[in-house]
């Protein structure tokens, strides 16, 4: 990181502290369950100082596997987690026919323990689902997500999709063919790209 980036990071982190404090005070729905295909949900929960009441933390599923999980959530909740040997530097799990990449875990034991613990905390009556338009997501995938029978769901997209109620356009990635790292700071004011979406209001109006 060059000196300019260090200064920008320090300025943003300082302001982020106060932004997070404000967001935490506004949050009235405590202990929600967030299912996210990537790290975005975990970043938001961390900002809000909320527990991880879902195993979908610090891991990644392909868009197709994520949709398959959501379409058959009751089935997958009963399936044992196993692991497969790969050339990846992190554990890769199998949940029936789904492949789960535990990118930020050091061992299969750690991944399995966290998966079991956080699965046991899930509250399907206080459920929120997040998906992101990246890693090969197609318009058909967005349509399938939009059709899922869940009240509280959002997919962050790199361009507007007015035909889909659950699609939320995140500005700043128009020149890319997908959404970038929306958990990064978007400027100098401590705001992150995902702050364009009022997730506190979303959680509170469940």
Curated annotation (Swiss-Prot):
Organism of origin: Haemophilus influenzae (strain ATCC 51907 / DSM 11121 / KW20 / Rd)
> Which SUPFAM superfamilies does the UniProt record give?
CAC2185-like
Protein name as catalogued: Uncharacterized protein HI_1244
Q: Which Pfam families match?
A: DUF1919
Q: Lineage from the top down?
A: Bacteria, Pseudomonadati, Pseudomonadota, Gammaproteobacteria, Pasteurellales
